[in-house]
A protein has these predicted regions:
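A residue-level marker of the well-folded mature domains of exported/periplasmic proteins
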Residues: 2-3, 7-18, 26-240
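Predominantly soluble domains enriched in secretory-pathway, periplasmic, or organellar proteins
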Residues: 23
């Protein structure tokens, strides 16, 4: 990806494709965007990004390669994201040289990134399992000239426009806020609720939790009577 204009065009297409996949999965709504970027940047809706047929043809002629390093591949959401990326890369003539699943292990993801780097992809699309523990691996990938697009959260200490191109995300805070509002209205503004949440330092779920709690403040007669965190998705039902 030697040409800066072409890189921007390609990233625009990937950003649109990823957000479109999220929309199809029910994660993006045509409403006010409440979330902000990792440094407080205003979010931009996918509908503002559009490529011409000529630009798409230029991407196809580029002979680019890509790798996808997932944080976890064992649910429908991840499967939808992967399929959306694979379909879009195929349409653009971009070869996928690796798809990895860290199974929510930072150590595994670091190893995955190191393995992927040996394949020298032009593009890396990834969701960090742990924004701190994986940071050095992403920095090494950036230093090697790989263009990184993060999904949902970035790795800590990386600079936008220098170490990575963009963060593509659903409106996680907004989704949590909407969930709280729907629940509050359904209860008629009164009642007791229990909250189950993902108990880890993972920005997307933390933002949804924050949005839900903020929405609950609008319903002073609704009390969160108990909370239960979990770290193992397979054991969530048992903990409940």
């Amino acid at each position: 990806l030697g040409d800066s204009k072409m890189r921007k065009k390609l990233v625009g297409m990937l950003t649109t494709a990823t957000l479109l996949t999220m929309a199809l999965a029910g994660n993006v709504q045509a409403a006010e965007i409440r979330s902000v970027g990792p440094d407080g940047e205003a979010a931009v809706d996918a509908s503002t990004i559009e490529l011409t047929d000529e630009q798409i043809e230029q991407v196809k002629e580029g002979g680019y390669t890509a790798a996808i390093c997932l944080h976890y591949g064992g649910n429908d959401w991840s499967t939808s994201q992967q399929k959306g990326l694979e379909d879009t890369f195929k349409e653009l003539g971009i070869e996928i040289v690796a798809v990895t699943d860290a199974n929510f292990s930072a150590e595994t993801q670091v190893s995955n990134i190191e393995t992927v780097m040996a394949k020298k992809p032009d593009i890396l699309v990834s969701i960090p399992t742990d924004a701190t523990a994986t940071a050095d691996a992403y920095k090494q990938a950036a230093a090697a000239g790989i263009k990184i697009i993060f999904m949902d959260q970035r790795a800590n200490g990386l600079e936008a426009g220098k170490d990575y191109v963009s963060v593509v995300s659903a409106d996680n805070y907004g989704n949590g806020y909407a969930s709280g509002t729907v629940l509050g209205d359904a209860l008629g503004g009164k009642g007791k609720v229990a909250m189950v949440y993902y108990d880890a330092n993972f920005a997307p779920t933390n933002q949804r939790d924050e949005g839900f709690r903020d929405a609950m403040k609008n319903y002073p007669d609704i009390e969160i009577v108990t909370e239960q965190g979990f770290t193992d998705e397979s054991g969530c039902a048992e903990q409940g």
